[in-house]
Amino acid sequence: MNIDMTKIANIILYMLHKQVKALNHKKIELLIFFCELNHLNFCGKKILGETFIKTSRGVKAEILDELFTLILDEVEFEDEEDDRVFFIQELMDFLEIEIIEKERFKELKFSKLDEDFDETIFTSDELKSIHKVINLYKDTSVRNLSNECFSLEKVRKSENGAIVL
């Protein structure tokens, strides 16, 4: 697993700072997808190293989705050396993560702990991509973000389960 959890946590802190509406784990995954896509298109590389897979409802982040599912399911780990334990702990060093029970599903809500968004860990180009995407989509619903994924030819033409980014 080659993903930068410190940068992910800081992007979530930035989303909280910018008061992204209805911010839950699904919206975070989609906003990160668009950040990665924007940066790849303009700079030729990803910011975080996350892989995105097409689903029937849009795209999901391979590692982040697994981590969020483990948190939602309140999984207890047998092996403390499991990378996922480290990744989840790193997120929780920056963020309070609360499981919210809805009528038909559960979702994760995030709030800031003591740390503020640290822009020094990003390059100026990475910051431009993050600012652009978050400002563009901060008021967009999860459903509309998912629909936006399908406006991309690469997503539309891929089979479910295929890597799209």
Give each language-model segment a name.
Residues 1-165:
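Domain-edge interaction signal
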